[in-house]
Amino acid sequence: FDGIIGAGGGFVQMGDEMLYHKKVSDEDVHRVVDFFETNHYDYYLESNGGLFASKNLIKRLESIIYGDLKNDPEARRKKEEEPSHFITALIENENMYRNDVNKICFLEHESIPFDEIRKQFCDAFQVIECTVPAFGDASGELSVAGVNKHTAIEALINHLGIDQKDTYAYGDGMNDAEMLTFVAHGVAVGNAKEGLKAIADEVCDDIANDGIYKNMKEHGLI
C-alpha cells in the first residue's frame, strides 16, 4: 500500500488513484467563511490544492510558534533558522470562497466559546474541539458530516481486501477517536489528549521520543 488518508478521512488516495474524496459544499464554505470573517476568526481552509490562510492567521501563528518577533531576538532567530513548515505552507491573499475545501480549521476566539461554533454548524458539519492544542482550547475543525478516519479506513480495507483484525492506528487528538475505536489495535501516543488515551487499546511513548516507531517495532510491523 502506497497512499494517504487525508483531511481527517475526507479523501483516500492510492498512488495516482483517488479512491474517494468528500468535499465541503460551496454553500457551506460560503456560510463558514462569512461567519468567520464577520467575527474576526483566524482560520484556514484545507484542500488538496493547498492550505489557504485568513488575513491575520500567519501573524498569529508566528507569535504562537516563534514568540515575540518584534522584541525577542531569539524569536527572530527561530523564524529565520528554524522556519515552521506549517507556516511556510500556508497561502495568503486568496479568495476564500473555494470549491475544493476538505475541511476548515480555526483558532480559539477570545470572546466566542466553542459551543457557539457547534451551535452554528452542527447541522452540516462534524464539529471537533481542540484538534491542535497550541491553537487554544476553543479551537477546532469543521469536517464533512459523516466523514472521519474510521470511514476512510473502512473504505480502504474493503477495497484492498484486508481484514479488520489486521488493522492498527496511531493518534494524538480527538479527531482520531473514531479511528482508534474502529481498528483492531488503536494506539494513542504519549502526548495525546487524555480523552483519546482513555479509549485507546494501548498508549505508547511520545512522538518526540519516536513512540510510533518503537511501538511498531514491538508489534513486528517493521
Where are these regions (language model features)?
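Conserved acidic, metal-coordinating active-site core of Asp-based
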Residues: 50-168
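Mg2+-dependent phosphoryl-transfer enzymes with acidic/Ser/Thr/Gly-rich catalytic loops
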Residues: 139-222
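Short, polar loop motifs at secondary-structure junctions
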Residues: 9, 110-112, 190-194
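A generic structural signal for well-ordered alpha-helical segments
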Residues: 36, 118-121, 196
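Active-site phosphate-binding/coordination module
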Residues: 1-70
